[in-house]
Amino acid sequence: MKIALAQLNYHVGNFESNTAHIIQNIKKAKQNGADLVVFAELCVCGYPARDFLEFSEFINQCELAAQQIAAECMDIACIIGLPIPNHKPEGKDLNNSAYFIEKGKVKAVVNKALLPNYDIFDEYRYFEPSTEFSCIDFKGKRIALTICEDLWNTIENPLYITRPMDTLIKQNPDVMINIAASPFSYNHDEERIAILKDNAARYNLPLFYINHVGAQTELIFDGGSLVFDNAGNLIDELPYFEESLTYYTLGDKGAVSFNHPSTLKKERESDIAQIHQALLLGIRDYFHKSGFSRAILGLSGGIDSAVVCALAVEALGAENVMAVLLPSKFSSDHSLKDAEDLVNNLGCMSETIAIKNITEAIETTLHPQFKDLPFNIAEENIQSRTRAILLMAMCNKFGYILLNTSNKSEAAVGYGTLYGDMCGGISVIGDVYKTQVFELARYINRDKEIIPENSIVKPPSAELRPGQKDSDSLPEYDILDKVLAGYIEHRQSATEIIKMGYDEATVHRAIKLINLAEHKRYQTPPILRVSPKAFGMGRRMPIVGKYLQ
């Protein structure tokens, strides 16, 4: 039996595009002699559809699309994922399902049993878990078809009380196929491989795993679909961060063969290399799928905006990126030069708009209220908000999307101005710690200098007052980021972090700042997720909570 794995980029709710893309790949697979072509979880509607799933018309559109797809499957079988109504009288209204289509008709329906309800996953909000498990017979082979999390329930770390494959294995399947929607975070590919490898070896069956590729708002899907033999050996993996249609032959006794050169990686890419690829895909798809093509950002001469600008140019093209220099009376000459050098290196569009006259006019207007009170954060934030007003005016006039340039360290401790430098359409590096931003800059410069060296080595500064440095207000980033990661990503308490050797006062101050800044994060743009625990939909904290204040 010849199996084709179709690793594709879908668009949530875009039934016309998704259906056409699926049918196009069915036709390609048929031309190449495939018996079965496999698509990803909820491919028909895109993942995650979120509250679109609460509209009955949305579910009807899924079924209409499935029927269009089925009409193309007279001489080839396919597996597609879609939400369908739960016809049982009890439980949620929907099932997260897979259709096995053969000879133009739905031959079998498989419903997902294990519904993730953690971090960015919220499937139990919409779907009823299945309690029935049956294999599918096709071309003399018996297929154990599962959906994503149904294979994620490992013996070592069980998340659920059931394990669908324990039931399916009793039906003597010849092969496992798992359709998935597994988003990217650094190191997640290694976890994914380990879990699937364990399943293939435990059940002594070859395993075909197909994933989404592409970005849906903040979630980035890295592809990297996998094929294992029945001993649990990883024998092939599809490319990361790009589409692929790849063919395999399933022989007797679980043998799997293929004719293409193996794309199996000899060694895993570094976290920073993966983050770089993920952010490029995240930017590109956010713009393409939202119907925009051009980006704008404020360019300060610092490392954060430099990295975001370089990523935007690589993702969208220099002709589609506008960098705006917005110097104030506190901006240093070297920062302006660093920004100009970056623009020259990238070849993107640029404008310079001085904000000194505007901020002074605002300060003069407020003088009757401010009187002779000393300069403080109020005047600092006027500068940041003035820049935001100008950038958003450019967006409205010329049709740009504003790129937010705040990093995760700043977002964590609230080192940013609401309605100022925290505004934007998408936050590019809001899930990238400051120390990782430095690494990302070095990675971008791996072949030649794109980001000026001075932007990388000079002390970070917001330049909102004379001689200002980030370290005046925050611990050094190489210490702060480790404390932040412990609290945010590993959910460690202050006591646990202090026991690791970090200064007690620093730890308590950092955690206090994180919790005090929660209200700011509720008002930030969507953040491209690259870590296991990003701010946004996967981290839900109360604004007025007192715990750990």
PLM regions: where:
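Enzyme catalytic cores with a strong preference for nitrogen-chemistry domains
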Residues: M1-G298, C309-A318, L325, S350
